[in-house]
């Protein structure tokens, strides 16, 4: 994790800089007015990872300065959720007093939620014994007795010990409606939960009064699929990562949403299937008849690399395109293609990563008349 200067007094200035940069990047496009969604100024980040430094009998969390690579001690981390900050000193004190828990511990990862659940992963440069499991169970019990809703994972080379779950269940509010999301350790989740709620509300607003079905590429754990399902007859969503697909299935059931179908495919494979270039048994096995879907709208939330040219061409086949981007530079590249056939009708900046140069953007495109 990068060096971060969390200074609430500077929040508006850093946001203004992002607004100016994003507008400048798209000055050559006919863009509508930019909608801006702010972050909480502190305690916004639901995940955090720290290295562990051992110094005699002492042990503490450290991070590294990105520019100098110098380590520095971290006892509290203002970017992280209050839950993480509350747990950090108690966890460290408990581990310091346990030779078996501290021996060759080199990293601690936290995954917290707005729902109150938290998952802690302890990473070791040694194999984990039965003695470690006993000590870890006692640690978990001790912290839960202090009021935390905590699960623990121990990791070592080719080894993973789960006490008792390797996921948390998050609860996000979308226009007052609660949605339950299973978030699995080491799988992608939106790091800024409050901004994630705003992104979902914006996407729901963009797709009001939609007709037909929705196709979604790169759906992850179904984060957007579930919230958007209310605006469509059916949702067909694709995702390649197996843990994310399994989490998405859990989330569909937990939210009792009956019109979402998730299939495990890459965007590139799905493009081939849609164009009839290849047949996939997994589509048949899942009972998915692509020809039965009437998808007028497509939703894409690609990785930082954006969409490849073939996927862009496939996406151009839809009347409306909703595109969430964690890298506006690749969004810019993709818009050079999409802009041939579509025009941008909504444009948004989501400040997922305050006090960094990273920006999250959203655009809604409609086919040119």
Swiss-Prot record:
This is tRNA/tmRNA (uracil-C(5))-methyltransferase. It catalyses: uridine(54) in tRNA + S-adenosyl-L-methionine = 5-methyluridine(54) in tRNA + S-adenosyl-L-homocysteine + H(+); uridine(341) in tmRNA + S-adenosyl-L-methionine = 5-methyluridine(341) in tmRNA + S-adenosyl-L-homocysteine + H(+). S-adenosyl-L-methionine binds at residues 190, 218, 223, 239, 301. InterPro entries: MeTrfase_TrmA_AS, MeTrfase_TrmA_CS, SAM-dependent_MTases_sf, TrmA_MeTrfase, U5_MeTrfase_fam. PANTHER family: TRNA/TMRNA (URACIL-C(5))-METHYLTRANSFERASE (PTHR47790), TRNA_TMRNA (URACIL-C(5))-METHYLTRANSFERASE (PTHR47790:SF2). GO terms for cellular component: cytosol. Its EC number is 2.1.1.-, 2.1.1.35.
């Amino acid at each position: 994790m990068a060096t971060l200067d969390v200074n609430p007094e500077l929040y508006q200035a850093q946001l203004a800089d992002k607004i100016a940069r994003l507008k400048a990047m798209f000055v050559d496009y006919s863009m509508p007015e930019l909608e801006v969604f702010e972050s909480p100024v502190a305690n916004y980040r639901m995940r955090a990872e720290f290295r562990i430094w051992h110094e005699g009998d002492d042990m503490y969390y450290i991070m590294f300065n990105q520019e100098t690579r110098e380590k520095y001690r971290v006892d509290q981390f203002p970017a992280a959720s209050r839950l993480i900050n509350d747990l950090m000193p108690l966890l460290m004190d408990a581990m310091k007093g346990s030779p078996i828990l501290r021996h060759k511990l080199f990293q601690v990862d936290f995954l917290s939620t707005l729902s109150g659940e938290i998952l802690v992963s302890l990473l070791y440069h040694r194999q984990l014994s039965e003695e470690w499991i006993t000590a870890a169970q006692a640690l978990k019990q001790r912290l839960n007795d202090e009021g935390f809703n905590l699960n623990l994972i121990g990791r070592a080379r080719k080894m993973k010990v789960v006490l008792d779950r390797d996921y948390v269940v998050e609860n996000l509010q979308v226009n007052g409606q609660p949605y339950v999301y299973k978030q699995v350790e080491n799988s992608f989740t939106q790091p800024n939960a409050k901004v994630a709620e705003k992104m979902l509300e914006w996407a729901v607003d963009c797709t009001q009064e939609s007709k037909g079905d929705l196709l979604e590429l790169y759906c992850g754990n179904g984060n957007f699929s579930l919230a958007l399902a209310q605006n469509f007859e059916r949702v067909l969503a694709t995702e390649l990562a197996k843990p994310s697909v399994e989490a998405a299935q859990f989330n569909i059931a937990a939210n009792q949403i009956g019109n979402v179908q998730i299939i495990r495919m890459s965007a590139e494979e799905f493009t081939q299937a849609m164009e009839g270039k290849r047949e996939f048994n997994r589509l048949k096995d899942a009972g998915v008849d692509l020809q039965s879907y009437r998808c007028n709208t497509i939703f894409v939330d690609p990785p930082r690399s954006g969409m490849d040219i073939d996927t862009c061409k496939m996406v151009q086949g839809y009347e409306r395109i909703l595109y969430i981007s964690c890298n506006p530079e690749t969004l810019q590249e993709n818009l050079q293609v999409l802009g041939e056939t579509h025009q941008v009708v909504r444009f948004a900046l989501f400040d997922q990563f305050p006090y960094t140069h990273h920006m999250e953007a959203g655009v809604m495109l409609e086919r040119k008349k």
